[in-house]
Amino acid sequence: MTGWHRGGLAAVGVAVAAGIVLHWFGSVDAVNQMLSDTVSSAPGAALLGVACAALVVAAGCLAVGARHAARSGLVRGLLGLWAAGLAALAVFPTNLPGTAVTTGAVIHRYGAALAVAVPPAIGLLVARTRRLRTASMVTGGAAALYGAAHLPAMLTGAEILPYAGLAERVVLGMTLLVVVMTAAALREGSEEWT
């Protein structure tokens, strides 16, 4: 296992741990509220920032691993776009339920869309196995379906659908699985160069 691969997996592990711990703070309903609503408490906001920062580190680690990948420039560019979306999530807080939608909240929401839409595209680009292609397509489809169902709330601040929080967390879990599988595919590709 290479250093960038270990670093990427460790960063995903930190993000998952921060995501789990942030549910212990505040009164966010994991089934019916968005993960971003944890910004209602200072510890929740800090842990959301830690999770996003860890995934930015993971993106950087994968970019190192992608240096010998087919379509390396495109893969690395998409990893940069993913990192930018994650940074937007951390820097621009969403509006809390029942409050006016701000410009920062809109930027946050576009960052959230990038955070779940980009990894499946990267997975498809580097896929060497049917397993990663399938996981990427299913995750991309789930993210698109979730995004379409959540679009009215994203654009207008309308009420979110029931179970939207649970659906979001399932899509996030699927996305992180694709990131881990993508790291493995990049590692296998980089080992051919050594």
Which residues are covered by each model-predicted region?
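Aromatic-anchored segments of alpha-helical transmembrane domains
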Residues: 16-20, 82-91, 141-152
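Terminal transmembrane helical module of multi-pass membrane proteins
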Residues: 130-194
